[in-house]
Amino acid sequence: MVKRKSEDAQLSARATNGKTARFAEATKSTKPVKKSATTKSAKTSTKPAVATNDTKSNSKPESLSIQIVTGSYERVLHGFAATVSETVFDPEASKEQDEPTYSDTFLFAAHSSAVRCLALSAPNEAHKRVLATGSTDERINLFNLSTSPPVVSDKPQLPSLSATSIIENPRNKELGSLLHHARSVNKLQFPTRGKLFSAADDNTVAISRTRDWTVLSTIKCPIPKAVGRPSGDTAGPGEVPTGVNDFAIHPSMKVMVTVGKGERCMRLWNLVTGKKAGVLNFDKSLLQAAGEGRYSSGEGRKLAWGEDGEEYVVGFERGAVVYGMVSDA
């Protein structure tokens, strides 16, 4: 019995030694397979990195789209888009890539008479702007313009004699017309997204709210006295030339200056109260320095404030004068 037990123990020990030896050989044989797999994956992972570098080097430069709107005496409102490559700001880029491409976006008769002025509002959250146009037909027409660049359509287009392509933007829509003035509209401006200022030959400046386009306030400028008949006067017999030529709003939105027909002065208005704050007359020496002759009207034609609001300029028929907030001229 003792001999049989010892023989059984030896057989079991041999069996266990054989199992451990086989397990050791199996583990040794699997190690090189794992190493070869890792090396292959490392080699394949480097290939996409080289491909991405090639695509970056061959990528085309991005482009900028600029929308331009013009109005004419032929009652036509013309909109077109200019696409410019961003390399135009790089002095080392070639000039051939800097040439812009143009495409018409809209072209139609917006008024029944000449277009006198245009104004664009700031974009809203939907990337849309309001375009206001003023005309001698006493109307202010409103349009909704999209700030996103027009997309070229794959649909067949009608033949055109124009040298530029035609790309219509379906997001552009007509909103309607405003009848806030009784005579020709000369100036439009959106100082903020919620306000529209308009000036006309009826000697008024109307302040409208863009939410519902109602008139919040109207500033009435005085009718000038008849002093001679200046050159270029188009008033009827027995009448005097009237109307607001231009206005300029201070960056603080508290002060506005206006110049009108038949007046050799500039008027200052308080936008908080809506009342006149002062008058600045143009003396003879100043008009002569600005190039105004003996038969000139001497009236201001254009106004503009500086960015900091410390200076403003008055434009005449043949020259301009820059004023400061402290000095006279």
Regions flagged by a language model, labelled:
Residues M1-S65, P100:
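Intrinsically disordered, Lys/Arg-rich low-complexity segments
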Residues S65, L268-N270, G274-A329:
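Structured C-terminal portions of repeat-based eukaryotic scaffold domains
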Residues T70-A109, T136-N169:
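Beta-propeller domains
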Residues G71-E74, T133-D137, A199-N203, R209-T210, ...:
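Conserved strand-to-loop turn within each blade of WD40 beta-propeller repeats
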Residues H78-F80, I140-L145, L188, V205-R209, ...:
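WD40-repeat beta-propellers
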Residues V88, S103-T105, V151-S153, K173-G176, ...:
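A structural motif specific to WD40 beta-propellers
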Residues T101, F108-V115, Q157-S162, E168-V185, ...:
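WD40/WD-repeat beta-propeller blade N-cap
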